């Protein structure tokens, strides 16, 4: 549980009225005790220590983010979210506060908000040159995939309702036409002619039903393929790569993203941290071929 050193006003209490010194631990000592408990996976006890540190000094953002992580480990996202928001009130540039807040919102299925906070955490980490490895990108990929799955589930439900509605309409129209045919031929003795007309009505509506089922089946088949494999997504933007290039470390990035990283953040590989210059980027032609084939077979990808 690393964090920048905090300045604590009145962390240690002095003597009062000539009495003996207060031996109770300072906020910093409570935080360090919480860190040790966290490493030992004693999350409730660690959270309690951070809570006592907050009581001692409620103006240090890292105490809240540390406790928020404990709450996340204990699967209590609501409590974690409250701590993250308080941490951001104290330090709006806190990477951990945005990161943990995004994780809380992911757990609570607030995918748009989760993605916004995780992207903010990623941007701040780059600006502050903090290395979180693949933790933030991994959480962002999960959030985007879950948001997409949520959209797909909603679409499936809407399509199912539409299919049921159209089925009822076709069935009702079939019954209406059959009843009308029967009324129009009341008193007629030519049953063969009536049966022939009814058969035509049945066949027409059977075809309507079959055509509709085929159309929905085609839509369903296309929908089943709506998933972009992780290996086709850039490790910086997390979107489908358009111009993949490979670094000497063997990592593939989308060219515009890695060039922006080199210009704005520094001349190093964002994953391996190895030194890297723009001249060392080599087009990954094999990956480009795979991506182009994927796009040609999945026109929906532009809306992903």
From Swiss-Prot:
Notes on the domains: The U-box domain is required for the ubiquitin protein ligase activity. The TPR domain is essential for ubiquitination mediated by UBE2D1.
Subunit structure: Homodimer. Interacts with BAG2, and with the E2 ubiquitin conjugating enzymes UBE2D1, UBE2D2 and UBE2D3. Detected in a ternary complex containing STUB1, HSPA1A and HSPBP1. Part of a complex composed of STUB1/CHIP, VCP/p97, CHRNA3, and UBXN2A that modulates the ubiquitination and endoplasmic reticulum-associated degradation (ERAD) of CHRNA3. Within the complex UBXN2A acts as a scaffold protein required for the interaction of CHRNA3 with VCP/p97, this interaction also inhibits CHRNA3 ubiquitination by STUB1/CHIP and subsequently ERAD. Interacts with MKKS. Interacts with DNAAF4.
Protein name: E3 ubiquitin-protein ligase CHIP
Maturation and modification: Auto-ubiquitinated; mediated by UBE2D1 and UBE2D2 and enhanced in the presence of MAP2K5. Monoubiquitinated at Lys-2 following cell stress by UBE2W, promoting the interaction with ATXN3.
SMART domains for the chain: TPR, Ubox
Residue numbers carrying Phosphoserine: 20, 24, 26, 150, 274
Resulting phenotype, residue 4 to R: Impaired interaction with ATXN3
Positions of region (Required for interaction with and ubiquitination of MYOCD): 143-197
Region (Required for interaction with MAPK7), start-end ranges: 102-201
Pathway: Protein modification; protein ubiquitination
Reaction catalysed by this enzyme: S-ubiquitinyl-[E2 ubiquitin-conjugating enzyme]-L-cysteine + [acceptor protein]-L-lysine = [E2 ubiquitin-conjugating enzyme]-L-cysteine + N(6)-ubiquitinyl-[acceptor protein]-L-lysine
Enzyme Commission (EC) number: 2.3.2.27
Domain U-box span(s) in chain numbering: 227-301
InterPro entries on file: CHIP_RING-Ubox, CHIP_TPR_N, TPR-like_helical_dom_sf, TPR_rpt, Ubox_domain, Znf_RING/FYVE/PHD
Top-level taxon: Eukaryota
Induction context: Up-regulated by inflammatory signals in Treg regulatory T-cells (Treg).
Compositionally biased intervals (Basic and acidic residues): 1-10
Gene ablation phenotype (knockout): 95% of knockout mice die at birth, surviving mice have decreased longevity. Reduced levels of CHRNA3 ubiquitination in the brain.
Described purpose of this protein according to its UniProt entry: E3 ubiquitin-protein ligase which targets misfolded chaperone substrates towards proteasomal degradation. Plays a role in the maintenance of mitochondrial morphology and promotes mitophagic removal of dysfunctional mitochondria; thereby acts as a protector against apoptosis in response to cellular stress. Negatively regulates vascular smooth muscle contraction, via degradation of the transcriptional activator MYOCD and subsequent loss of transcription of genes involved in vascular smooth muscle contraction.
High-level lineage: Eukaryota, Metazoa, Chordata, Craniata, Vertebrata
Name of the gene this protein is made from: Stub1
Extent of Gly residues compositional bias: 11-20
């Amino acid at each position: 549980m690393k964090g920048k050193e905090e300045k604590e006003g009145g962390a240690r209490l002095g003597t009062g009225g000539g009495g003996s010194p207060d031996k109770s631990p300072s906020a910093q000592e409570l935080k360090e005790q919480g860190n040790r408990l966290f490493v030992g996976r004693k999350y409730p006890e660690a959270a309690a220590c951070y809570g006592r540190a907050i009581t001692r000094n409620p103006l240090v953002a890292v105490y809240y983010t540390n406790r928020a992580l404990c709450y996340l480990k204990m699967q209590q996202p609501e409590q974690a979210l409250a701590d993250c928001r308080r941490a951001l009130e104290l330090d709006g540039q806190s990477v951990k506060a945005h990161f943990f807040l995004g994780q809380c919102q992911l757990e609570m299925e607030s995918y748009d908000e989760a993605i916004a906070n995780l992207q903010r955490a990623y941007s701040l980490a780059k600006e502050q040159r903090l290395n979180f490895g693949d933790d933030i990108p991994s959480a962002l990929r999960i959030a985007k995939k879950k948001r997409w799955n949520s959209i797909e589930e909603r679409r499936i439900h809407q399509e199912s309702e539409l299919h049921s509605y159209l089925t009822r309409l076709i069935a009702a129209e079939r019954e209406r036409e059959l009843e009308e045919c029967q009324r129009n031929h009341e008193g007629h003795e030519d049953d063969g002619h009536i049966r022939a007309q009814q058969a035509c009505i049945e066949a027409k509506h059977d075809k309507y039903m079959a055509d509709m089922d085929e159309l929905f089946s085609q839509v369903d088949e296309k929908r089943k393929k709506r998933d972009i494999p992780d290996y086709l997504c850039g490790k910086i933007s997390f979107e489908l790569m358009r111009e993949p290039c490979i670094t000497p470390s063997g990592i593939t990035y989308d060219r515009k993203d890695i060039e922006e990283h080199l210009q704005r953040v520094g001349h190093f590989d964002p994953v391996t941290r190895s030194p890297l210059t723009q001249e060392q980027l080599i087009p990954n032609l094999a990956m480009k071929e795979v991506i182009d084939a994927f796009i040609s077979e999945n026109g929906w990808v532009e809306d992903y």
